[in-house]
Amino acid sequence: VAHPEIDNGTPFAFEPVFIADEDLRPVIVTVVKATYDFDLQGALQLADEQIPVNLAGEPWSDVPVSSYKYEPEIALCKLATDVVLIGHACPPQAGATRVDVGIKVGPVRKVAAVFGERFWVFTKGGIAKSRTAALERIPLTWENAFGGHDKSRSTPERTVAEPRNPVGTGFGKPLAKDGDHLRLPNIEDPKQLVGQYGAVVPPCGFGFTSPNWQPRASFAGTYDAQWNKSRKPLLPADFDRRFFNAAAPGLIAPGYLQGNEDVVVLNVTSMPRVAFRLPAVSPPRCRVVLRGRQDTELPTNLDTVIVNTDEQQLILLWRAYALAAGGPHDVTTVEVVATS
């Protein structure tokens, strides 16, 4: 297969990705990825090492089912900007049992209450919460939010799980005998805390969601007998491109961020508050040259903003796509240029 010539005129990482759209038409997706370093005083600079586009994604751990630390960066498009926070809750003083963690990027904001370890415990007097342990650095993962699955009621044919976060904790697992216990979530919505045993609350998180989780999975369309008969292997006619947005509920912007928005993170570093602005960078422009046809100019959209407070990195992704009827063989040149 002939590979297109790549001309990257930006200081950022760039990757052309060849996939298919909903109707199995070959498309080229141009993904531009910028990495910036920031310090705790809010100074931002372009990183010496630009992180490459991550086609496979990266889980938080190597257990068979883990939440994504970084999603695979191969979406066809996103209809709005995803905002993702990667890091740990950091209590401002020793001995604290709760800290409120937050992020704000332009119009997008979210706050969570983060607690030290605690459990539901079965005793002769009933099921009660244990004492809350002093907070240490708590990873802001979906594993530490409300959710999980109930192994006692699951079968090989059917898993009983919290559909919005099957990797979390606090869901299911009946407590029936003395000493039985169930870990409560560390991360909760401060407006909807877990009040009593058996309560079901919205999982609260800051990370990437997985395609099979709700509400994201509801946008994947209807896979029924009619689809099987008349449309398979294409995606269902009611597939909704909102499926491609992978940020947590509350962290999808109303449209695309433009750059220069203010960013504030709370209680996720040794400094309780860190603030800076997104770089005032215009979206890069891509030009795709198709064999025997006119060039296609592709303006990109800033569709993913990742703030990693562990590494003190800001990652921005811009994306665009174009039909390429012959797949990679149809594309002779891909250029990307920075715009002022």
Write out the residue ranges for each language-model feature.
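Extended intrinsically disordered or low-complexity segments
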Residues: 3-340
